[in-house]
Amino acid sequence: MNVTLRAEVAADRDFLRRLIVETVTLELGAEAWPEPMRSHLLGIQYTARLHSRRVEYPGAVSHIVQADGADAGWAVVHTTRDEVRLVDIMVLPELRGKGIGAAVIAHICATAADRPFRLEVNLMNSGARRLYERLGFRITGQDDVQYLMEKLP
């Protein structure tokens, strides 16, 4: 599978909404929530996710992940003089487990050069944590919600 990154553009909003809503639905177990509550709360999650990434990491670059030319995910990367930080990464649920996330991480690692590459992963997301550990990240701390992970150059 050929995995590439391209810059996010305004025309990607429908794809991002679908991706974020599907991801959050799985994260929160929202499949069984009654409508219209489900749509309303997932819409709030979509807006909050986009807004918080832009406020917390001004200057971060949002990428659409493509697998064999089709939109497959989203990666937000914030680069400073001192570090490269993966702010967010999502892959469509039906495409998970196919190496797309690993390919994105490898690409970002290559751009990190001589800087540490840092990220956070939810304490409940053991699959992502194992992936990051396989790719050379180690846990450097944790809070009530997430592990802090780092890969040194």
Region locations from a protein language model:
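Conserved N-terminal entry element of GNAT/NAT acetyltransferase domains
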Residues: 1-14, 18, 153
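Conserved beta-strand positions that form and line the central face of beta-propeller blades
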Residues: 4-7, 64, 148
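Acetyl-CoA-dependent GNAT
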Residues: 10, 17-93, 105-107, 111, ...
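Structural preference for beta-strand elements that scaffold enzyme active sites
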Residues: 83, 116-118
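Conserved acetyl-CoA-binding loop-helix of GNAT-fold acetyltransferases
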Residues: 91, 97-110, 129-134
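Conserved beta-strand-loop-alpha-helix junction that forms the acyl-donor binding cleft
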Residues: 96, 118-129, 145-152
